[in-house]
From Swiss-Prot:
Protein's gene: gpb-1
Function: Guanine nucleotide-binding proteins (G proteins) are involved as a modulator or transducer in various transmembrane signaling systems. The beta and gamma chains are required for the GTPase activity, for replacement of GDP by GTP, and for G protein-effector interaction. In the early embryo, controls the magnitude of the forces acting on centrosomes but is not required for generating asymmetric forces.
A GO-annotated cellular component: cytoplasm
WD repeat residues: 53-83, 95-125, 141-170, 182-212, 224-254, 268-298, 310-340
Signal peptide stretch: none
SUPFAM superfamilies: WD40 repeat-like
Organism encoding this protein: Caenorhabditis elegans
Assembly and interaction partners: G proteins are composed of 3 units, alpha, beta and gamma. Interacts with G protein gamma subunits gpc-1 and gpc-2 and with egl-10 and eat-16. Interacts with goa-1 (in GDP-bound form).
Name of the molecule in the record: Guanine nucleotide-binding protein subunit beta-1
Pfam families reported for this sequence: WD40_Gbeta
Keyword Cell division attached: yes
Length: 340
């Protein structure tokens, strides 16, 4: 038996010890605890606004912290900032590369960012003196596509990439401050914790990881999915998070219990999940699917509570406003829809 096989065996034994330790700490299940909760009933939401203007598939969207404006990125090579109340386009930004996969709105509302197959995170300033929008910084350094980016503030942004890493950047200097390494597959998504001290990443190695932004270390790894994780989203309390995967399930993981609490799936749902987001209370989990629908799950009772049907193609992205009053879905049908 080679040394490598011995080490593999040892690693497997350690993994099963961890599984046993998790089991012994698991004194009840979420289903048991949630069984005496009132059912929330059928969630029926209507399309309040349709944002038309993109000419190709929409790949990403992100709400501004004012819960009114949002930014969307499309294969038509445009980044559009919308006013969701009036459906007006506040800015239409032509991109240098049309192969965009992610976009983000800075908490201050002064900047947006995007990136994709160009491997670069581009930062655009919305509040220039001249009134025009321009690239204020380009952040090259990833050796694979940019899959997700989120601002910490106007000078720091976290990115995830197809090069199996995440990174923290100083926007002013354009330098990478921290590299977060440990995934063994493309990192597809990230979600910042409510206190901005940690973030979760989901990757094609079918695991999610919790990272400390300040020291760059991976604090926890969460296995369980059977295929790529495409989307992750923190629970509003910051103590749990949801994942969406190509294995046709969403799952809820508890950070303090260090394990999976719930799985959201249905025999009729056989396609992958592209995006996930929680309602303000965390009771509802919105998930966008390849079959053109957005399912609404009761996160506690693990039941389907509703469906947002209105797109004619894959729902590629979704987001809930900070005030919790609206959901936006973006699709390959080139439209964004606002629901409540």
């Amino acid at each position: 038996m080679s040394e490598l096989d011995q080490l593999r065996q040892e690693a497997e034994q350690l993994k099963s010890q961890i599984r046993e330790a998790r089991k012994s700490a698991n004194d009840t299940t979420l289903a048991t605890v949630a069984s005496n909760l009132e059912p929330i009933g059928r969630i029926q939401m209507r399309t309040r606004r349709t944002l038309r203007g993109h000419l190709a598939k929409i790949y990403a969207m992100h709400w501004a912290s004012d819960s009114r404006n949002l930014v969307s990125a499309s294969q038509d090579g445009k980044l559009i900032v919308w006013d969701s109340y009036t459906t007006n386009k506040v800015h239409a930004i032509p991109l240098r590369s049309s192969w965009v996969m992610t976009c983000a709105y800075a908490p201050s509302g002064s900047f947006v960012a995007c990136g994709g197959l160009d491997n670069i995170c581009s930062i655009y300033s919305l509040k220039t003196r001249e009134g025009n929008v321009r690239v204020s910084r380009e952040l090259p350094g990833h050796t694979g596509y940019l899959s997700c980016c989120r601002f910490l503030d106007d000078n720091q942004i976290v990115t995830s990439s197809g090069d199996m890493t995440c990174a923290l950047w100083d926007i002013e200097t354009g330098q990478q401050c921290t590299a977060f390494t440990g995934h063994t597959g493309d990192v597809m998504s990230l979600s910042l914790s409510p206190d901005f001290r940690t973030f979760i990443s989901g990757a094609c190695d079918a695991s999610a990881k919790l990272w400390d932004i300040r020291d760059g270390m991976c604090k926890q790894t969460f296995p369980g999915h059977e295929s790529d994780i495409n989307a992750v989203a923190f629970f509003p309390s910051g103590n749990a998070f949801a994942t969406g995967s190509d294995d046709a399930t969403c799952r809820l993981f508890d950070i303090r219990a260090d394990q999976e609490l719930a799985m959201y799936s249905h025999d009729n749902i056989i396609c992958g999940i592209t995006s996930v987001a929680f309602s303000k209370s965390g009771r509802l989990l919105f998930a966008g699917y390849d079959d053109f629908n957005c399912n609404v799950w009761d996160s506690m009772r693990q039941e389907r509570a509703g469906v947002l049907a209105g797109h004619d193609n894959r729902v590629s992205c979704l987001g809930v406003t900070e005030d919790g009053m609206a959901v936006c879905t973006g699709s390959w049908d080139s439209f964004l829809k606002i629901w409540n």
